[in-house]
Amino acid sequence: YTLLINDLHQTAQEIQQKELHTVRGELALLVAVLINSFGVVLMLYSGAGISAISSVPFAFSEVFTRISLGTWTYLFQGVLVLSLMILRKRFVPQYLFSFVVGFVFGELLDVHEAWINLLPLTLPNRILYFAISYLLICIGIALSNRCGLPIIPTDLFPRELADITGAAYSNIKVSFDVICLAVTAGMTIFFLGHLDGLGIGTILAAFTMGKVIGAIGKWMDGRLRFVSVLTPKTAKPC
């Protein structure tokens, strides 16, 4: 009887896997990097404030203006990668590839900043830009968490920290975002004399994005199966 139940369960899983559409993890990661880098710059351009994951590099770029936002971004990501290795208490080669992905992400930020001013700035457009950027970032992070490849360190950090601590990803993500915002607020107020880069959109994103990413991820899990050269099985979702 037990063997019969196990066979039925395995058969059901195989049928479910066949019904899922297969997506290459490499393509998912490429899309995630492209739309996340654009989403971060578009959110800042909307005037609603920068996304929480890029708020700390933004603060450094405003205080130390000789270094671009993109450069500060991958420097910050390097710190996150090092922190994860310390928490793991071992060298993790995949984290180095994650840093390379983060470097590309940082360079794309500078590329988008160079042309974003061509977009018209009206109040309706600002609202539209924020909505689009919010959705793009959520989709990008959900894709990153499922691509089966090392991902951008700012996306990797909360996912790995959730795995290390055993806490829920959505809770870790919200806490990470809020801490980033607190650091940004402290730096800009102390060095610039005023709050810079943070707006109502930033606060809204920080407190809701983790939940929205989780919801989008569940939607993907019911329809898509991600495979890559590193992880032939579906990456563990968050």
What feature does the model see in each segment?
Residues 1-238:
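Core subunits and conserved enzymes of cellular information-processing
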